[in-house]
């Protein structure tokens, strides 16, 4: 079973550790370099502790960290970052976590993937397509990023 646990400020270091894995995965799609320390530049998480519309969640499976999600709530709600540890791939955990997020923030959603990240595009098309019964809009921006838009309030899981 997948659980979303809101990240507390005192757990910021744990989230930053997971973000290192996330950024590493992104180096396949974008030119991201390590810093002299041997780490990737950390994310600025301060706004997550002060801004009411920014939300960070650990994705947990049976008490074990399986990933994280970062959301900006509003109109539309936006998946800012979403990561599942590779050992949890293809077990439905990402889909379950995404559906829980859609339910937590009912309304319009926008989900974007970078140009070369075909695995993410395929994942989100499948998840959103299944969730909405195929009733979503997909477009591409000037950077060839794919963007899916839909309203989760219309398809809330009972």
Where are the model-predicted features located?
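Conserved GNAT-fold acetyl-CoA-binding loop/helix
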Residues: 23-45
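A short beta-loop-alpha structural element at the N-terminal edge
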Residues: 2-17
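Conserved acetyl-CoA-binding loop-helix of GNAT-fold acetyltransferases
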Residues: 84, 90-103
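Conserved beta-strand-loop-alpha-helix junction that forms the acyl-donor binding cleft
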Residues: 110-125, 129, 139-143, 147-151
